[in-house]
């Protein structure tokens, strides 16, 4: 979840560090479909930036592929899943039951954090048809 210029810098650095044939894996926030209208894409990116207070700029699958190939990588595998980052089941799967209880306790007892989480969840739900999780494995050629 980086600004566009930072994505290229990070990918370039990964390319520099890897040996030929080395694998680079990313797991990012994505946009779907590939033909998503530019105004809709900009609106989603703007809403995300406001609610998570980071200049998050998710890309479509074809944009991720283009970015990686532009920096010298060959795509090996791409997987996508629905955006479930703030869903209870996903939190338990990611964090485990006890850690999820602690997160829940913090959300309940910290109004500022609760408001932030609720805003993020509202944005994720509003754009769930156009947001996904994307994982890409690429090889340095």
What are these regions (language model features)?
Residues 15, 72-73, 139-141:
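A generic structural signal for ordered secondary structure
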Residues 55-78:
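Short alpha-helix
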Residues 50-52:
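Short N-proximal segments of mature Sec-exported proteins
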Residues 9, 59, 119:
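Short, conserved clusters of charged catalytic residues that mark active-site
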Residues 1-6:
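A short SAM/SAH-binding and catalytic strip from SAM-dependent methyltransferases
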Residues 77-141:
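Conserved Class I S-adenosyl-L-methionine
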